[in-house]
Amino acid sequence: MAQTTRRMAEKLGGVTLRPVYQLLRPNSISGRTLNYVIKERLQTRRHLKWLVNATGVATQMLLPFARLAIRANRFLAARTPPASPLIEVSRHDHVDIDTWTSLWTKFKAVMPATCDRSWQFYEWRYEHVPDLRYGFSVAKRNSEVVGILVWRKPLPDELNVGTIVDILADPNDLDVVTALLGDALDVLSTTCESVVARTSHRALLAVLKNAGFLLVKRHCPTVVSSKHDTRRLFENHAEAILFSKADHDWDQIHVAI
């Protein structure tokens, strides 16, 4: 939302929420990917058009530095404390209705202002979506499901980027979140050049950064509603709002051109 539009919305009673952070965890980078990134960055800058046409040279110059920076970031991320041995994590292609609904009920009590994550959402978002296939890391503590992380590998015609789509767990339960994230990264980091994620919760942001994710950009959503109760819900639960890549189309196909 443009700043002018946001100010108009706020004057009409709209509620601007805390930032949603976009993060990236680089694992490696190929010349093809770096070339693509350079073109994307410079294609709207006419005064640098000559550099766009010479990206092969720019890529060769920048590639060693990019790889060195990635190695340094991975070295620092390797110091992240290991997950708690009390948390057991398993991987699945699907989640059953009882497991998902039970966890959503507990999650909603902790994060009441979060967008719908009901079973209907699960089916619509993960089961019936065309083309895309999702994986699920499920965490248990004392045989009780305490968290689910949804992840996605790239399609063959996409950029080689894995996606942390959603984390359905108490954001402040760091043992669970750390275990889930570690399991998902074990899957994605072996084949993906990088992994992306989004979150609006500061506790999750800290866990992601500790795991080697870098902050790319952020933006602040604004809630516009004629319902007073809806506005109050967001105003009174600033710490209980969670946005991720499951909201909107933030995890959809990114074609590598």
Can you say where each PLM-predicted feature lies in the sequence?
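A conserved beta-strand-loop-helix scaffold within acyl/acetyltransferase catalytic domains
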Residues: 3, 83-169
